[in-house]
Every structure is written in structure tokens, then in C-alpha cells.
């Protein structure tokens, strides 16, 4: 990215910050609590960026002084070595700050702070694909535990030999979507299934969709568009299983989206969960349609969330997980144990770099 473009954006941010400072000092603003809170929040959001930019300017001045010292220290080996070391340290800090400032200039995604509905569907591979879907579910549950997130299954279709034909997990916590959005797509596994007697390696797939939770204000649903029915559902056990219809089957007629929810103990709770899933699915559908109208280059980026894209292969024989978007390998056991931080960080970095290039191109 052109440094002059970055500097112009940072100078504009500083001007905005200074204007906010003046507004906050205005007595008429102090008398309006709502406006005061809005301006104070915006000031707090911009302050780290402004402080980093001021530090970068200070580093530039210190770098020039160190260069001058280096010129003047010719013939004095000890002083020259000190000047070289200082230049190295200053250059390293400048590089880190430059990168941080570039990323900070990217438009924020308002969905990043949201919790998610994570849907896993068994794909090609029959029973083995269902088992693989179960393995992926455990991987995400372990990662969520590491992050301190809450995980609740809200809809599940279990397979006869284990695993799931389909599973939807509600994962709630801070900035869940910002991390898990990179998991959307086709996950392929290459391994010898437990049901394979000849020891042959099979290839199976499961599809992951990551949908930010949608508030009722985000998605308007006309009750006339819903077809809701109930069914008997397994649950707490005993006579309740056979006599009480707690499962909810919800159909959104305009889109054909169907949600079957059985995990809660009451029909009312299952209906609420089904509506949560439907809102998330409708919001995801709107976003997919909007993305389809964008350029092919934009849709191909790391964080596109295209559920038909093969994003990763898990090779048991070689103990290797390959992320095809990054062209990088990661230890299989580490990934399956839910230690996804390195992988997610690499995806985030690649996504940010691509967006920076797009931002610079759009401004040129």
C-alpha cells in the first residue's frame, strides 16, 4: 500500500479527533448527555490510532537523529555499533507500527462482535462423513472452551453409527464471528474409517456455515410467511417423550428454509431457538446474495464465507492439516484438539492484507 495514501488517511483521522476534542469541550455538548456519550465513544475509538500515529512521527524523528549520529561516528567503532543497534530497533518498531496503523484504517465489520450459529452438515462419504461432522463439532467446542465462549446445541440430526447428519451450535461470547467466520466452507478429511476393514484411505467431507446471530430488528419476518408444526421429541426421558409434542418444525415459505428444533425441553423454548436459527439463516442468505453481486476477486478472499469453497484438508496419514486459501500446513492433532489460534491468526492476516490492497486500489 502506498505510504502517502496511509499518511493522508491518518492525517484525516487526527483532524477528526481534534474536532471531537473541541466539541467535547463545548459546554452545550456537556449539557446533552446523549450527544456527549456518542462523541466520547468516537473519541475513545480513535484515540489509540492517533497515539500510534504520533508515536510513528516521533520514531521518524529519532530515526533521522540516529542516522546523523551514525554519519558522525565514523572512525569510532563503539559509537558506530551503538548507532547501528539503535537504528535497527527504531526500524523494527516503525515497521510494526506501520502495519498496525494500516490494519486500523480498514473499515470495521459490525458483525465481528456477534455470537454465531455454526452449522455443520455431513457431505460426501456416507457414515464416515457423519462421523467427521462429529469430529469437527468437538474441535469447535474445544476451541470455544479455550476462548471462554458458551456452546449450546440448538438442532441436531444424529447418525446411526455416530456423529451427525446435521448439527447447529449456538456459540456465544465476545467477538465470536471475528474468529469463526474463516471456518465457513468445505472441510475434507482423508483417513482410514473405523468401518473400513481393508485399511483403505477414504475421502469424506463436511460443510460448515457460520452465521452471525441476527436480532429481530436485523431481519423482519412476517408471521404469515411461517408454517409451524410440532412433533414428539426425545429429551428428558420417561413418559414425557411419547406424550408431549415439544419439537418444532418451522418452514419459511418464501425461501423454503426449514428449521427443526428438538434440543430444548419445552415447545416454547424450541420455537424461540428455531426463530433464532431462521433469522441467522435469512441474514446469511441476504449477505450471500449481496456477495454474489461483487467481483469474483472479492468473493475469493479468505473471509468470503462461501460454503461451497473447499477450504481445508485434514490428512491423518501425514498428520497434516492444509489450509488451501493460505497454502500452509498445520499439525493435525493440534488443530483437532481445538487449538485454532495460529490458523485463525494466519487467516486474519491474509484477509487484512487483501483488504488493504483493495482499499488502496479503490483510492488510487
Swiss-Prot record:
<protein>
    <recommendedName>
        <fullName>Peptide chain release factor 1</fullName>
    </recommendedName>
</protein>
<feature type="modified residue" description="N5-methylglutamine">
    <location>
        <position position="239"/>
    </location>
</feature>
<comment type="function">
    <text>Peptide chain release factor 1 directs the termination of translation in response to the peptide chain termination codons UAG and UAA.</text>
</comment>
<dbReference type="Pfam" id="PF03462">
    <property type="entry name" value="PCRF"/>
</dbReference>
<dbReference type="Pfam" id="PF00472">
    <property type="entry name" value="RF-1"/>
</dbReference>
<dbReference type="InterPro" id="IPR004373">
    <property type="entry name" value="RF-1"/>
</dbReference>
<feature type="compositionally biased region" description="Basic and acidic residues">
    <location>
        <begin position="306"/>
        <end position="326"/>
    </location>
</feature>
<keyword id="KW-0488">Methylation</keyword>
<comment type="similarity">
    <text>Belongs to the prokaryotic/mitochondrial release factor family.</text>
</comment>
<dbReference type="InterPro" id="IPR005139">
    <property type="entry name" value="PCRF"/>
</dbReference>
<keyword id="KW-0963">Cytoplasm</keyword>
<dbReference type="InterPro" id="IPR000352">
    <property type="entry name" value="Pep_chain_release_fac_I"/>
</dbReference>
<dbReference type="InterPro" id="IPR050057">
    <property type="entry name" value="Prokaryotic/Mito_RF"/>
</dbReference>
<dbReference type="GO" id="GO:0005737">
    <property type="term" value="C:cytoplasm"/>
</dbReference>
<dbReference type="GO" id="GO:0016149">
    <property type="term" value="F:translation release factor activity, codon specific"/>
</dbReference>
<feature type="region of interest" description="Disordered">
    <location>
        <begin position="292"/>
        <end position="326"/>
    </location>
</feature>
<keyword id="KW-0648">Protein biosynthesis</keyword>
<dbReference type="InterPro" id="IPR045853">
    <property type="entry name" value="Pep_chain_release_fac_I_sf"/>
</dbReference>
Amino acid at each position: 500500500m502506498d505510504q502517502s495514501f496511509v499518511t493522508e488517511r491518518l492525517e484525516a483521522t487526527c483532524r477528526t479527533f481534534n474536532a471531537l476534542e473541541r466539541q467535547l469541550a463545548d459546554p452545550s455538548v456537556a449539557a446533552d448527555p446523549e450527544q456527549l456519550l456518542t462523541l466520547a465513544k468516537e473519541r475513545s475509538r480513535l484515540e489509540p490510532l492517533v497515539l500510534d500515529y504520533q508515536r510513528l512521527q516521533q520514531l521518524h524523528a529519532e530515526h533521522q537523529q540516529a542516522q546523523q549520529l551514525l554519519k558522525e561516528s565514523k572512525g569510532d567503532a563503539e559509537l558506530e555499533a551503538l548507532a547501528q543497534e539503535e537504528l535497527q530497533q527504531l526500524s523494527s518498531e516503525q515497521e510494526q507500527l506501520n502495519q498496525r496503523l494500516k490494519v486500523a484504517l480498514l473499515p470495521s465489520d459490525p458483525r465481528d462482535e456477534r455470537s454465531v450459529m455454526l452449522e455443520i452438515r455431513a457431505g460426501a462419504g456416507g457414515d464416515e462423513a457423519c462421523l467427521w461432522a462429529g469430529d469437527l463439532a468437538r474441535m469447535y467446542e474445544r476451541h470455544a472452551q479455550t476462548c471462554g465462549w458458551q456452546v449450546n446445541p440448538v438442532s441436531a440430526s444424529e447418525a446411526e453409527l455416530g456423529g451427525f447428519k446435521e448439527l447447529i451450535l449456538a456459540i456465544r461470547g465476545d467477538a465470536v464471528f471475528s474468529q469463526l467466520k474463516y471456518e465457513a466452507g468445505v472441510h475434507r478429511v482423508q483417513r482410514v474409517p473405523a468401518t473400513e476393514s481393508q485399511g483403505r484411505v477414504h475421502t469424506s467431507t463436511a460443510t460448515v456455515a457460520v452465521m452471525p446471530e441476527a436480532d429481530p430488528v436485523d431481519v423482519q419476518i412476517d408471521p404469515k410467511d411461517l408454517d409451524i408444526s410440532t412433533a414428539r421429541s426425545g429429551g428428558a426421558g420417561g413418559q414425557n417423550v411419547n406424550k408431549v409434542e415439544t419439537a418444532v418444525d418451522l418452514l419459511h415459505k418464501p425461501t423454503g428454509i426449514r428449521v427443526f428444533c428438538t434440543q430444548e425441553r419445552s415447545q416454547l423454548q424450541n420455537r424461540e431457538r428455531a426463530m433464532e436459527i431462521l433469522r441467522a439463516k435469512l441474514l446469511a442468505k441476504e449477505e450471500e446474495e449481496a456477495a454474489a453481486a461483487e467481483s469474483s476477486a472479492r468473493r475469493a478472499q479468505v473471509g468470503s464465507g462461501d460454503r461451497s469453497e473447499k477450504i481445508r484438508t485434514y490428512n491423518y496419514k501425514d498428520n497434516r492439516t492444509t489450509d488451501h486459501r493460505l497454502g500452509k500446513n498445520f499439525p493435525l492433532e493440534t488443530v483437532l484438539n481445538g487449538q485454532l489460534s495460529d490458523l485463525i491468526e494466519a487467516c486474519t492476516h491474509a484477509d487484512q492484507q487483501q483488504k488493504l490492497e483493495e482499499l488502496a486500489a479503490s483510492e488510487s
